[in-house]
């Protein structure tokens, strides 16, 4: 099974349609040997000191070295800054999809931002599967089919 991760639901659904992954699940599409899932933009952010159990930070506590520099995006509510529930739920779905697959295709934007989004997600979820990069310039059926063909997939050049 091959997992494809996009950075927007509409892109994921379009790629899934072209590849024949037409069975809708909660947060992803599956079928024809593919599981296509998506993020909602940046669902991860830098961890705050309180995320690593530090209630109050003083100069003597520096340098702060949290167990992870990334955490689930937080949103401001009446009770303060809390983890974004929607981001947390989608991250669990993405983790489930990636764990069920042998290969992962990064289909986020082919920009620094899109690459960073995928690499942060890959590291945060502690993925070990090999990754390929999908370079796509439009969402036409022909462009998607051509981009998914073996010659247009490139292995990540650096260790993730």
Regions found by a protein language model. Give the residues of each.
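A short, hydrophobic C-terminal helix/tail in secreted or cell-surface proteins
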Residues: 155-160
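Intrinsically disordered, low-complexity regulatory segments
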Residues: 1-154
């Amino acid at each position: 099974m091959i997992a494809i991760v996009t950075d927007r639901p509409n892109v994921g659904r379009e790629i899934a349609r072209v590849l024949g992954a037409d069975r809708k699940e909660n947060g992803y599409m599956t079928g024809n040997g593919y599981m296509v899932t998506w993020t909602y933009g940046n669902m991860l952010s830098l961890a705050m000191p309180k995320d690593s159990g530090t209630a109050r930070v003083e100069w003597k506590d520096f340098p702060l070295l949290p167990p992870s520099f990334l955490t689930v995006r937080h949103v401001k509510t009446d009770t303060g800054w809390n983890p974004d529930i929607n981001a947390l739920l989608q991250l669990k779905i993405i983790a489930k999809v990636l764990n069920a697959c042998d290969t992962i295709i990064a289909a986020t934007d082919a920009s620094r931002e899109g690459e960073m989004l995928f690499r942060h997600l890959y590291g945060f979820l502690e993925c070990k599967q090999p990754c390929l990069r999908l370079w796509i310039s439009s969402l036409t059926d022909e462009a998607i089919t051509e981009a998914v063909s073996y010659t247009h997939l490139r292995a990540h050049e650096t260790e993730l």
